[in-house]
Regions:
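Surface-exposed extracytoplasmic segments
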Residues: 22-219
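Gram-negative bacterial Sec-dependent N-terminal signal peptides
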Residues: 1-22
């Protein structure tokens, strides 16, 4: 499984407990039933060095297989779901920093990165985090915000994942033994909802390498 920012009024996002949901392109039991459960589905998670070389970009994609056109225009983040990016800076496989993202009324609100002392399947929005920010959720035109050196984006993007799911199913079912070269990209021309946070490396710290993963948690 692929695992898987500045000051705003804390009243905008109410404090609530969120419980973790497992996902990976709709094949996890918690999200393969469709309906509201699919809104927590994590399709992919990416982390890479930013263009300046002094930052790290974290990209969490949710709600895969969104068709172009009206389906993408009408796709929305679930306001009862928080996206949590976990960052392990010391190599002990436990998060040291967390970035939370939750939508409200057409905007995505971010909290962190802030220090995390323990791992848990449930979370509370850290409305007292020193680093906070928000960005309008994009439509056809991408909207970004930059504050305190942290950049934010939330909205629909083309799904970059390449996978021949039909051939994969045939291999699992015993009717094929290998993938074709080239294969057919099942995800071509489909979209996802993306949350992107680009953070200065100085805010991450650590020894130079990190472990990172993402979770969705439902209220």
């Amino acid at each position: 499984m692929k695992k898987t920012k500045i000051l705003i009024a804390s009243a905008i996002v109410c404090i609530a407990t969120f419980v973790a949901i497992a996902a990976d392109h709709i094949d996890a039991p918690a999200v393969n039933g469709g309906g509201s459960s699919s809104l927590t589905d994590i399709t992919d998670f990416y982390a890479f060095q930013g263009s300046s070389g002094n930052s790290i970009a974290f990209v969490a994609n949710v709600q895969g297989f969104i068709a172009p056109g009206s389906a993408t225009d009408n796709a929305t983040f679930d306001e009862n779901v928080v996206i949590e990016i976990n960052i392990d800076t010391d190599g002990d496989a436990s998060q040291d920093l967390v970035i939370q993202a939750i939508p409200r009324d057409g905007r995505m609100y971010f909290f962190g990165p802030f220090a995390s002392t323990s791992a848990s399947l449930s979370s509370t929005i850290n409305t007292t985090a020193a680093l906070q920010g928000d960005v309008a959720i994009s439509g056809q035109t991408a909207v970004t915000e930059n504050s305190n050196g942290i950049q934010y984006f939330a909205g629909p993007r083309d799904d970059p994942f390449f996978f021949d799911f039909v051939k994969y199913s045939e291999i699992i079912g015993g009717t094929a033994t290998s993938f074709d070269n080239p294969g057919d990209d099942t995800f071509a021309s489909t979209n996802v909802l993306s949350v992107v946070v680009e953070v200065p490396k100085s805010m991450i710290g650590g020894t130079g390498s990190i472990n990172t993963w993402v979770e969705t948690k439902r209220k």
